Amino acid sequence: MARLLQASCLLSLLLAGFLPQSRGQDKSKMDCHGGVSGTIYEYGALTIDGEEYTPFKQYIGKYVLFVNVASYUGLTGQYIELNALQEELAPFGLDLLGFPCNQFGKQEPGENSEILPSLKYVRPGGGFVPNFQLFEKGDVNGEKEQKFYTFLKNSCPPTSELLGTSDRLFWEPMKVHDIRWNFEKFLVGPDGIPVMRWHHRTTISNVKMDILSYMRRQAALGVKRK
């Protein structure tokens, strides 16, 4: 009951416009293209244990944040902040989904079965357990990229004009809309259409403010979430 009351109070503040909004961040955030053909609900993925196929249509009516993750990256500490983001915004209908990938600096080298133990005991360590769903390791760029990532990337402009150092990037062919590094993020709205894309170094606090601002606009338009 207390949790519901807290969520209700926070939502009231959000709708009233009393929560701070994100400031302009150059290309740390890009709005996605209008008139996108199709939705994320046409796709799905296997959970990290490989035992369950999750169709993304189960997230109809939810806000969904897609994040490509890695266990041995300088940004792996974002896992802790992502847990906090999931806990804080879940009452407003947000679900985070994590997709391990080894294409950036070979920083996710282990098997699927090794990823959760690595997070728990190595980095971030200290018994860490993600409170959001992780899926099987796979490619987010290149010839074998997962199809839903093709959809996400084609729906949103890139956050940087540069791809990065080629000897640390492991895919072909390279394209302008490709993900630049681990922990890039895409927000999909309650209708399954991509809304925003964030640079991997954008702070989670700014990501949160951007999401809250979008939720407020949706509420003002009378858009219902699940």
Swiss-Prot record:
Q: Which GO terms describe its molecular function?
A: glutathione peroxidase activity; identical protein binding; selenium binding
Reaction equations catalysed: 2 glutathione + H2O2 = glutathione disulfide + 2 H2O; tert-butyl hydroperoxide + 2 glutathione = tert-butanol + glutathione disulfide + H2O
Q: Where in or outside the cell is it found?
A: Secreted
Active-site residue list: U73
Keyword Signal listed? The answer is: yes
Tissue distribution is:
Secreted in plasma.
Residues in coiled coil: none
Indicate the family of this protein.
Belongs to the glutathione peroxidase family.
Q: What is this protein called?
A: Glutathione peroxidase 3
Gene name linked to the record = GPX3
